[in-house]
């Protein structure tokens, strides 16, 4: 759900069910910060798909994803993520996706 969209920023809330994950991806320009509202998740980030570091995040924790950072989020429990980013909604380069996107 997009809750704000201006020429300067976008705010979204993402809901992910346990065991599901977002694409392994990066953004060329988009700069985003995620804040885990509820639940627990695994977050992988690094300079390339071969150099990812795994971090466990719980409710109330945040992480900034700068442009060119390869990343993926996977829900351990049901999660809700608050995302604030620059307004580049189509700036997604998918490296791997479980759902064929």
Residue locations for each model-derived region?
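Short acidic-glycine-tyrosine-enriched beta hairpin
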Residues: 47-68
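Double-stranded beta-helix
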Residues: 74-101
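A short glycine-rich, His/Asp/Glu-containing loop-to-beta-strand
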Residues: 1-30
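Glycine- and acidic-residue-biased ligand/ion/polar-headgroup-sensing regions
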Residues: 28-47
